[in-house]
């Protein structure tokens, strides 16, 4: 039986991607196979990421793209700079909303607490950016955003990087208010003196 894994891939809004051989059109649920029988992250294969945040290194705006859970199979080759993987075969499984994307990014951090953080993750405190999300990790993390932004907040144990508590929620203007700092329990926390 062929080995299969799940990963993440971003596409243009029309489900196209630019490959070494040009633009490729995808459809959900269809298996695609690379002509080369050996995947090589530097020159061929279908490129995906194990950390959904790494997709934003290639498609910088979540609003101008689509992020999907994909199933990969066949020969695979891991990249050296982030969680990028090149696979011989790929199939689009599920499109992610922004909240699902951030939740899965938080799950990846929880599963790999000792890996270096993606540049979209901020230590201790984070403010939602142009991609409408913020992820903060630390012993006393906090985050804030505007209405519609998604916050992921992960508290580590004091003596190691393991995650002790985590939350992910949308600033909805009712339960969670805009421009208010929240902790990993989803509770309001005070701003730093210089922020008041």
Language model segments and positions:
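Short, glycine-biased loop/turn motifs at secondary-structure junctions and
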Residues: 1-196
